[in-house]
Amino acid sequence: MVATSGQTTQGYVVEAYGNLLRVRFDGHVRQGEVAYVNVNDTWLKAEVIEVVGQEVKIQVFEDTQDVCRGALVTFSGHLLEAELGPGLLQGIFDGLQNRLQVLAESSFFLKRGEYVNALCKNTLWEYTPKAVVGDVLVRGDALGFVKEGYFNHKIMVPFSCFKEVTITWVISEGSYSVDTVVAKARDAEGKEYSFTMVQKWPIKQAFIQGDKVPCHEIMDVGIRILDTQIPVLKGGTFCTPGPFGAGKTVLQHHLSKYAAVDIVILCACGERAGEVVEVLQEFPHLTDPHTGESLMHRTCIICNTSSMPVAARESSIYLGITVAEYYRQMGLHVLLLADSTSRWAQALREISGRLEEIPGEEAFPAYLASRIAAFYERGGAVRMKDGSEGSLTICGAVSPAGGNFEEPVTQATLSVVGAFCGLSKARADARRYPSIDPMISWSKYLDQVGDILENKIQGWGKAVKKANYFLREGSEIGKRMEVVGEEGIPMEDMEIYLKAELYDFCYLQQNAFDAVDCYCPFDRQIELFSLMSRIFDAKFSFDCPDNARSFFLELQSKIKTLNGQKFLSEEYKEGMEVVLRLLETKMVQTA
């Protein structure tokens, strides 16, 4: 059993319903407090979710088999907390922050009632103090640094310390474990504090110290359709809803590999175990294109699969965002990938049903929208007291049943995110990957990105809007052609349709399994998009639809081959010259 704090409150089980227990107690209990239920001398972890008089309802994070009426329940006196400190990166945790590598040493399966420390107490970290005796500090200020991966991990005054403190003692530089006291301090009332490298924080409370500032930096992800059509800023929020088989998980894995951020928190809260295994097998052998290090050096994985208890699935998404906020406070850029928030919402629905609350649409709780909004609002860019800036970008995958974007989880998400990347089953079936549908997707950051890129390519924002115009018009013309055929439309419309198809095939589509095309750097995107803009503005001379189609198919083939060539290599330069010469053969004038 995990140690409790101070004078503990105890109670006993009076009713059990699945993993929801009704407990009568004598003393003081808070909502959200951690409790432990005694079952055959094994202590099961639980959380208080409702307090009514001298009775509480608790959700147990384990299988409640053998729980009987009168079973002893002990309340810990503290909320469900995350353990934060050096060693989180390269870690693989469940929703209760048990380190799965340690649990795997004892058994292939998780044993009931077995909990381990999130941070290894034996690992030594090379600590460099920054604070000196006499410094007056507040929560979030740096006490010192340790080297974690390729960046400095800031050891901070714990966020649970709400008063100004004066440093009275600092440890010397050296190698220490995370539970070593590295500094001591005293507040104005004379209370003494001892600070280690570890701090704890309730996962359902926002972890922030500093001023929220507007997002102003592009998050380059190497996917052309995202960087161009549906851009996201560092500190922004976006969602990727789509039906089964549309490619949500492959898209999220791509983001975790290539997004231009410092830290990636991968929160697999309710997806299939095989997908998590794929990440664990691939990531240690993949290289981060931005740093040259292993991808695992910047990744923390929290993996609650669908087979794990519903209650633990709900806590995993809060654990993920708390860890992400912790690294943001160090002035780092963090990306949180939650796959999938629909499973989290289903956990809320199940718990709400057991609490006998009045259901909302599709039996989801009435407060679903506010819970989702509160989650996404924890993202954003923050400026710290020392002037450094950190950001937390949130990407939530949504799995609507049957691809129905009108269901409550998708609608609640759309109202709070800054960008919507809707995945289409039709595009996935047509093998147009990534299957993000540009007709239904949007981004509130498009104008801001246009202003940022104005110095690199003049008129970027207008060019993207023109590309959107061609996509919309091309889609409408394509629908008419299905009815009247190619002969029933004028040549001008045929030209617009073929330009839209060229843009879709050569720019929006991308091969995630090609060694070169899987990641398209921003400079390469600018050059390719400039070529597309030139084609949009050009007028061509064709005497019949067949000649027009033949020309654009040849152009498609040349540009698609170009996408597979290494940027600025001799083959790439020769391929670009071939494309430009081919254009000049049919181009009559430029608008």
From Swiss-Prot:
Residues binding ATP, per UniProt: 242-249
UniProt keywords, alphabetically: ATP synthesis, ATP-binding, Hydrogen ion transport, Ion transport, Nucleotide-binding, Translocase, Transport
Protein name, entry field: V-type ATP synthase alpha chain
Top-level division of the source organism's lineage: Bacteria
The enzyme's E.C. designation: 7.1.2.2
One Pfam family per UniProt: ATP-synt_ab_N
Family of the protein in this entry: Belongs to the ATPase alpha/beta chains family.
GO molecular function, one term: proton-transporting ATPase activity, rotational mechanism
CDD domains assigned: ATP-synt_F1_V1_A1_AB_FliI_N, ATP-synt_V_A-type_alpha_C, V_A-ATPase_A
